[in-house]
Amino acid sequence: MPLLHLQREKQTYGYFSPERFVNSQGTRTDEIAMNPAYFAVCPPEEIMQTLCHEMCHLWQHHFGKPGRRGYHNKEWADFMEAIGLMPSSTGAPGGARTGDKMADYAIEGGRFLEAYESLMTDDYRISWMDRFPSREKLMAAIANGTTDEMAGDLSIMGLAGISVEDGEITFEPGERPNKSNREKYTCPLCQRTFGASLA
């Protein structure tokens, strides 16, 4: 049984890491990490696709023959197709089925969409999101319309930098949260700027 982990790894929706964790008895378990920074800016279908993509890596690690680290081989691609996800280097039809950096898309009438549609009802949804999503990802999601179906949820959740009015999502520029452990100060006498630790 893998450990499901939320991790803000830059430029990745998720990843699989075999035998990443160990308990006090020495038992090892695998890790599937999901990036919560994308939860507010990606449709739920895409988030579930990422989880299934990583679960295919988990399956291959235990029951198949994984390629070299990071490589998505034919066996993995065949298993993805079997569960209803088409591997694609571009994330769209026509992309390569194997390679180092791979995306995927749902196959119409496939097992993934069937399971997704039965799971994602009014009673079930991804109900927690990062309140401070990446500005770049947020603006791109608003521009290409991927957040449209989530307008109601985004409005209720009060995400920083997002305004929703009559179903219309807009980006509000504002101050970014201070992610460092330092605060910037300016000397009133000499006007020099310096940093001081917040701790």
Predicted regions and their residues:
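Hydrophobic (often cysteine-bearing) scaffold residues that line and stabilize catalytic clefts
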Residues: 44, 48, 52, 72
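Active-site recognition of the HExxH zinc-binding catalytic motif
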Residues: 49-62
